[in-house]
From Swiss-Prot:
Residues modified to 2-(S-cysteinyl)pyruvic acid O-phosphothioketal: 115
Role according to the record: Cell wall formation. Adds enolpyruvyl to UDP-N-acetylglucosamine.
Protein's name according to its UniProt entry: UDP-N-acetylglucosamine 1-carboxyvinyltransferase
Source species: Photorhabdus laumondii subsp. laumondii (strain DSM 15139 / CIP 105565 / TT01) (Photorhabdus luminescens subsp. laumondii)
Major location category of this protein: cytoplasm
GO CC entries: cytoplasm
Active site: 115 (proton donor)
Gene: murA
One GO term of the biological process aspect: regulation of cell shape
Reactions listed under catalytic activity: phosphoenolpyruvate + UDP-N-acetyl-alpha-D-glucosamine = UDP-N-acetyl-3-O-(1-carboxyvinyl)-alpha-D-glucosamine + phosphate
NCBIfam families listed in its UniProt record: murA, PRK09369.1
Pathway the protein takes part in: Cell wall biogenesis; peptidoglycan biosynthesis
Length: 421
């Protein structure tokens, strides 16, 4: 497995170009299964999870080509099963189920894998599809869905706010007969982006980005061209990189209005923030950040995918800060690794109390999930000495060319290729 070797400490400063959002590109790629004409997707990041999704779409009979944009032609889909060998590394594969059963009347997806950060069950996906009229069977590790004719619109009240289940229900309802209303829907910008994509193809979705989404079912979707929105989590990660190192960064091709909760906490930490239509900058003027207290929450609250980065910020900040994780279990697995680098922290249940230290020391550390791996790489950038971050396949799932972008900010980082042994 590849590793990163990071030599610090470094003050990270400069400009970085933000990639397309992984968490929008994935549901949009799966939603392209609904289209009966070719689709061109722009600003799709080059990531392991995107590659896995393209392989999965190809397995189903979809023609997918990458040539700058990603071109998806789902006219000749002739397989309706997402097999275990492709699904096991990526939970997003469940998003194939809704489009398959909506357009073809059948679909089956192996129970998914992905990051080891809690249960994240698929029961809300299943319940939503059943309320649309699908028959669901769990058999031999697969979720199997079928329907005679078209799905039927329904009023669905989500028991719990779920990004994944909101996407599944919304995409399936696009081709359902009648009107579907999703109450207590997730409000993430990536859901709004997926709805905007579907509307480009001829869907009739209103309210995406709020907790009340209405979908007027249509008989078919055509083709179109769509540009994926910028990645707010990547943007936040590079802003934190500058904040923890006393640096200054300008994030270009960003969408600052998706980052309100993160920017508010960075200002609280003492950062000077400036924003434009498609850029955001942070300047620490060489100062240490101040510790902040926060709770993760569904959008528009503080995103769980920025929790690990802010844990690191608190661990090198002035003072002490408390972070409470309300979305996922087991999402403090990076903390013991940071403690090995000299951080002071105490975990109790779903809360971590961070006591800031002036400096971290190098160590060999192991990434456990996508966002935790980013925090360890950033820790290496500011720690004294050479830090080795193992299992970086996690980071390749969600950050496009992160070592190149960090080098552009002055980081001393290299990828050590696996020998294959």
């Amino acid at each position: 497995m590849d590793k990163f070797r990071v030599k610090g400490p470094t003050r990270l400063s400069g400009e970085v170009t933000i990639s397309g959002a992984k968490n929008a590109a994935l549901p949009i790629l799966f939603a392209a299964l609904l289209a009966e004409e070719p689709v061109e997707l722009q600003n799709v990041p080059e990531l392991k999870d995107i590659d896995t999704t393209i392989k999965l779409l190809n397995r189903l009979g979809t023609k997918v080509e990458r040539n700058g944009s990603v071109f998806v032609d789902a006219r000749d889909v002739n397989q309706y099963c997402a097999p275990y060998e492709l699904v096991k590394t990526m939970r997003a594969s469940i998003w194939a189920l809704g489009p398959l059963v909506a357009r073809f009347g059948q679909g089956q997806v192996s129970l998914p894998g992905g990051c080891a950060i809690g249960a994240r069950p698929v029961d809300l996906h299943i319940s939503g599809l059943e309320q649309l009229g699908a028959e669901i069977v769990l058999e031999e590790g697969y979720v199997k869905a079928s329907v005679n004719g078209r799905l039927k619109g329904a009023c669905i009240v989500m028991d719990k706010v779920s990004v994944g289940a909101t996407v599944t229900i919304m995409t399936a309802a696009t081709l359902a007969e009648g009107t579907t209303v999703i109450e207590n829907a997730a409000r993430e910008p990536e859901i709004e982006d997926t709805a905007n994509f579907l509307n480009t193809l001829g869907a009739k979705i209103t309210g995406a980005g709020t907790d009340h989404i209405t979908i007027e079912g249509v008989e078919r979707l055509g083709g179109g061209v769509y540009r994926v929105l910028p990645d707010r989590i990547e943007t936040g990660t590079f802003l934190v990189a500058a904040a923890i190192s006393g640096g200054k960064v300008v994030c270009r091709h960003a969408q600052p209005n998706t980052l309100d909760a993160v920017l508010a906490k960075l200002r609280e930490a003492g950062a000077d923030i400036a924003i434009g239509k498609d850029w955001v900058s942070l300047d620490m003027h060489g100062k240490r950040p101040k510790a902040v207290t926060l709770r993760t929450a569904p959008h528009p609250g503080f995103p769980t995918d920025m929790q690990a980065q802010f844990s690191l910020l608190n661990l090198v900040a002035e003072g002490a800060g408390m972070i409470t994780e309300t979305i996922f279990e087991n999402r403090f697995m990076h903390i013991p690794e940071l403690i090995r680098m000299g951080a002071h922290a105490e975990i109790e249940s779903n809360t971590v109390l961070c006591h800031g230290v002036k400096k971290l020391s190098c160590a060999q550390v192991m990434a456990t999930d996508l966002r935790a791996s980013a925090s360890l790489v950033l820790a290496g950038c500011i720690a004294e000495g050479v830090t080795v971050v193992d299992r970086i396949y996690h980071i390749d799932r969600g950050y496009e060319h992160i070592e190149d972008k960090l080098r552009g900010l002055g980081a001393n980082i290299e990828r050590v290729k696996s020998t294959g042994k």
